[in-house]
Design a protein with these regions (language model features):
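Charged, low-complexity intrinsically disordered regions
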Residues: 1-43, 110-111, 226
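ASCE P-loop NTPase motor core, strongest for the SF2 helicase catalytic module
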Residues: 31-257, 264-371
Length: 371
């Protein structure tokens, strides 16, 4: 009976003369083993006390958002990373911003900046909500920045929040990895689910004291996705990908229930997922959001050529009231609108991509993965 009860701990830990030595990240396995025999000695309390919303947050959190914020503070104090996996629409952005306002409270010592990596379509929304709900300073890291790789703190050190996109992270990882951030936050963290992708390899190069992943997709649904997310959040929890494949993926696929439960116990303390039906049934099923899209480089070149052509028509006949001239102008405006959607609407030989189309596909994939 004793062996059966503590078998998982024996497999995960190292036996010493006085007991079993385990990594702090194996807290979930310890929690499960002690739950019945020594509930008073649990390393993680099941009921986390609510932390007061910090000064500077200009929003009233719903009860479940208060719990989510308090859960993140609890992990922060223990030195752990986490994955907030609430359904879309439950306010993962606000909960995260509340955590960051808590960390950067005026009475706290000066901390390094936090890097928030987001899909391009969500960049505007994050900046807008950060300005609206917090008193934190912020900047966007983009292609216009000239940052000294040897002294990145000269730029990053002036702000609390640094926003950037996954594309910028991939293309400028040499700069971003030269600075040790307080937090690295990945929104729509499904972007790193492919461990062979450049996005994943770039994300795990980032340096920080703490890491947080935000997703509306249940990461437990795919074991390889689960490993990739946790290799970013808490690299020492699930080991290397090959070891994880051997220790967990293969046995679980063969129907080994004990191993499946063991994996669930290991990861449970670091994942918080609530459904809309569970915590906020009063929220409307349909929400409307305006998403701003940037044109791709090739698309923008076509757009600028058409715009210059239209400008020349206007400059050549500035006072013309000729109906044919007016038609040419209206047709030019229509062509600009079509180019902003996708150049192939008027240029059959165009082989590039479109910012809007890419965003529609990305948003559809997100909605589909979230049910």
């Amino acid at each position: 009976e004793w062996f059966s009860k503590y078998r998982n701990l024996l497999e995960l830990g190292t036996q010493t003369e006085t007991g079993i030595r385990l990594k702090p990240t194996f807290v979930g396995a310890v929690q499960s083993a002690l739950e019945e025999s020594s509930p008073q000695n649990l390393p993680f309390r099941r009921e986390i006390h609510n932390i007061p919303v910090p000064q500077g947050v200009k929003a009233q959190l719903r009860p479940y958002q208060q719990k989510g914020f308090s859960w993140m503070v609890h992990l922060h104090k223990q030195g752990f990373g986490g994955c907030l996996a609430d359904d879309m629409g439950l306010g993962k952005t606000l909960q995260t911003l509340t955590l960051l306002q808590y960390i950067y409270k005026p009475s706290a010592p000066k901390q390094p900046a936090t890097l928030i990596v987001v899909p391009t379509s969500l960049l505007h929304n994050w900046r807008r909500e950060a300005k609206r709900f917090t008193a934190l300073s912020m900047a966007e890291y983009n292609n216009t920045m000239a940052i000294d790789k040897e002294q990145p703190e000269k730029f990053f050190g002036h702000f609390h929040l640094i926003f950037t996109t996954y594309g910028m992270m991939r293309n400028n990882i040499d700069i971003l990895s030269s600075y040790r951030f307080e937090y690295v936050v990945l929104d729509e963290s499904k972007n790193i689910k492919n461990s062979e992708s450049l996005t994943f390899r770039s994300a795990i190069q980032l340096q920080s004291k703490h890491r947080l992943a935000l997703t509306g997709t249940p990461i437990e649904n795919s074991l390889k996705d689960l490993w990739a997310q946790f290799h970013f959040i808490q690299p020492d929890l699930l080991g290397t990908e090959s070891a994880f494949q051997k220790q967990f993926i293969m046995p679980i696929r063969q129907g080994n229930e004990r191993v499946r439960v063991q994996l669930q116990q290991l990861t449970a303390p670091f994942i918080l997922r609530r459904s809309k039906k569970e915590v906020a049934p009063e929220l409307p099923e349909l929400t409307e959001e305006t998403i701003y899209c940037d044109m791709t480089k090739e698309q923008n070149t076509c757009y600028e050529q058409e715009k210059n052509s239209l400008r020349n028509i206007l400059l050549q006949h500035p006072q013309s009231t000729n109906r044919l001239h007016s038609f040419s102008v209206l047709n030019g405006i229509l062509r600009l609108r079509q180019l902003s959607c996708h150049p192939q609407l008027i240029l059959p030989d165009y082989t590039g991509t479109s910012g809007k189309t890419a965003q529609i596909i990305e948003t559809f994939d997100t909605l589909q993965s979230e049910g």
